[in-house]
Amino acid sequence: MAALSKSIPHNCYEIGHTWHPSCRVSFLQITGGALEESLKIYAPLYLIAAILRKRKLDYYLHKLLPEILQSASFLTANGALYMAFFCILRKILGKFYSWTPGFGAALPASYVAILIERKSRRGLLTIYMANLATETLFRMGVARGTITTLRNGEVLLFCITAAMYMFFFRCKDGLKGFTFSALRFIVGKEEIPTHSFSPEAAYAKVEQKREQHEEKPGRMNMIGLVRKFVDSICKHGPRHRCCKHYEDNCISYCIKGFIRMFSVGYLIQCCLRIPSAFRHLFTQPSRLLSLFYNKENFQLGAFLGSFVSIYKGTSCFLRWIRNLDDELHAIIAGFLAGISMMFYKSTTISMYLASKLVETMYFKGIEAGKVPYFPHADTIIYSISTAICFQAAVMEVQTLRPSYWKFLLRLTKGKFAVMNRKVLDVFGTGASKHFQDFIPRLDPRYTTVTPELPTEFS
């Protein structure tokens, strides 16, 4: 690891804004590019969100544009202020240290930028960046040999996270809001211990509707016969008295859960691939067919379907074994269900859910009075996390998540890739590992060190 005290004498033009010697011009160019990309990102995002949430006309007339501009200003400021503090730190310190091009410049820039964003969005941004920073630090540790990778580590992390999430889901007031609604959609309300209605009453209503349907005169078609046959199979079979899936036996309950969530996962992955498929509709029509039989479609479907079926099957099995329904069953069922990630391995999903779990447990600790509340914690965590990611983007881009690196390139119109990283190689992080062929054309009138000479510590 590079020593923090070591430095190099180069100026900000030689390392940072190699495309123009003027700090002011470079700042304005970064600002303009970042603003353009920010508007391209947030305008459709907020518009689609407003349509899905069925916002009223008043929102479109008075709130939509200000929210778009506020979020775009936040993202623009994050990129532009990084460039500003990059130059300011060089002028103040007189040289570059290993931490100044990335962490040092990004920390104050991120702190000021996040204050521009709406408070309601800061928490989500903080979770995302904290997740990304943790993943980046892990990769840094692996690259340095200080951390040993664990085979299928993301699956194990997901198993532990799923176990805790399902336990909180089963507990009264364990989860609230979107998280509770999402899990209820995935595993079904049958796994919630308490319901707002009596299960027996619901079962009676179902039976009553079924009888009324059967009393209707008319010729029974083939679909009706098949449906009646399937219902009879699902209805007759083993079901423990503690199980609340009154319309199915335990076996059909698990099978139906798998089919339902497999379909959801398959359709989600198809929808995600639609934009890219339609871009090649006229040039490569055959790619449209691949939209439906792509391998990832079935992988996500198998992941979600097996998660639900394993969770439900384990829960039913434990109810049969112990002859009772217990919230602790959710820990075992959730952990075993987490193995389903073998079908769709994703470090991003595991890390994000683990981060959200830590956040949930932290706020539960605050409510219980066992954990202190830190004001402005989201702002501070966001700033530090973003600074860590920028440090990686400058000094060792190979440890940064590829999707975030592409985002930085888009935000800066590709200028993040034209930094003079060969000069930074002296710090020992392999800064130019993926930029071996790039040599900036610098104007000798504005340089402190003659270009192309070996760099030495001062």
UniProtKB/Swiss-Prot annotation:
Keywords: Membrane, Mitochondrion, Peroxisome, Transmembrane, Transmembrane helix. The keyword Transmembrane applies. InterPro entries: Tmem135, TMEM135_N. It holds the Pfam family Tim17. The chain crosses the membrane at residues 68-88, 96-116, 149-169, 298-318, 331-351, 380-400. It comes from the Eukaryota. One of its GO terms (cellular component) is mitochondrial membrane. The keyword Membrane applies. GO terms for biological process: alpha-linolenic acid metabolic process; fatty acid derivative biosynthetic process; fatty acid derivative transport; long-chain fatty acid biosynthetic process; long-chain fatty acid transport; mitochondrion organization; peroxisome organization; regulation of mitochondrial fission. PANTHER family: TRANSMEMBRANE PROTEIN 135, TRANSMEMBRANE PROTEIN 135-RELATED. Involved in mitochondrial metabolism by regulating the balance between mitochondrial fusion and fission. May act as a regulator of mitochondrial fission that promotes DNM1L-dependent fission through activation of DNM1L. May be involved in peroxisome organization. This is Transmembrane protein 135. It comes from Homo sapiens. The gene is TMEM135.
